[in-house]
Amino acid sequence: MTKNIEYVPEQQDLVWIDFQPSKGNELRGRHPAVVLSASGYTRMTGLVAVSPVTHGINNRLKEMFVPVITNFGIDGYVNPLQFHTFSVVSRNVEYAGGILDDSAFAMVMKTHQQLLNIY
């Protein structure tokens, strides 16, 4: 890894991340997200895997979303149907002040596992 990363995201952290640039109907702008990847992955690659936190109440697949309520200003739903890998430095990843609770994180990871095992 060539760039020095001051903050190394930990799995389950809630972070702020820049989703720009984006194309089509992809999420745009700076949004909260939950970290899916382990910190060792970030140390090795400089990348972080995340699922966005959204307020997308009109999404037809919302029943698969996982509710997020915090005492540090992040609320909405984790969309486990979307997962992205981004550069920690280029996407200006910042710790949001807490983690996703264990049961909600388990639901997100279970949905990911189910999605990746569809064939």
Regions found by a protein language model. Give the residues of each.
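C-terminal terminal-subdomain/extension
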Residues: Y7, T70-Y119
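Short, charged beta-turn/beta-strand-edge "cap" motif at the junction between a beta-strand
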Residues: Q20-G24
